Curated annotation (Swiss-Prot):
Gene Ontology BP annotations: DNA-templated transcription termination; transcription antitermination
Protein name, entry field: Transcription antitermination protein NusB
Function: Involved in transcription antitermination. Required for transcription of ribosomal RNA (rRNA) genes. Binds specifically to the boxA antiterminator sequence of the ribosomal RNA (rrn) operons.
Keywords: RNA-binding, Transcription, Transcription antitermination, Transcription regulation
Gene designation per UniProt: nusB
Similarity comment: Belongs to the NusB family.
Top-level taxon in the UniProt lineage: Bacteria
Length: 143
């Protein structure tokens, strides 16, 4: 398993923990993970970068997921699947340095590992709609 996959999995665990424990804020949660998860600095830094990006852009990320999830409210989605999609959607919408196919494939593989049997297809079905829409929603940078 590659360094970035491990970082994404660690980021998923952080986001899931934040969703599951409203009494702990993001800074405290990141500090807890630093103390309790013995990982390399490179792995931890990319994971924290992903988590901070998701938290910073969460309203836009959740809106993009919600707009593409027919008959599913965010509150009904399994937390693991939702946080996998949040990570990938952050990459798709805000990280031009990561190819869209890579983000989606990584999300599907993480869903296979952490989700249930339906998670990979569910995650893929929603994320597959985001790249073309996210690209259309980006401002024209040449102006």
């Amino acid at each position: 398993m590659g360094l970035r996959r491990e970082s994404r999995e660690l980021a998923l665990q952080m986001l899931y923990a934040l969703d599951s424990n409203a009494s702990v804020g993001p800074r405290e949660m990141l500090q807890m993970f630093r103390e309790e998860q013995p990982v390399s600095d490179r792995l931890r830094l990319f994971a924290e970068e992903l988590v901070q990006g998701v938290l910073e852009h969460r309203p836009a990320i959740d809106a993009a997921i919600k707009a593409r999830s027919k008959n599913w409210s965010l509150s009904r989605m399994p937390k693991v699947d939702l946080n996998i999609m949040r990570l990938a959607t952050y990459e798709l919408m805000f990280r031009g340095d990561i190819p869209k196919k890579v983000s989606i494939n990584e999300a599907i593989e993480i869903a296979r590992r952490f989700g249930d049997k339906d998670s990979p297809a569910f995650v893929n079905g929603i994320l597959d709609e985001i790249p073309s829409c996210a690209k259309a929603e980006e401002p024209d940078r040449e102006q």
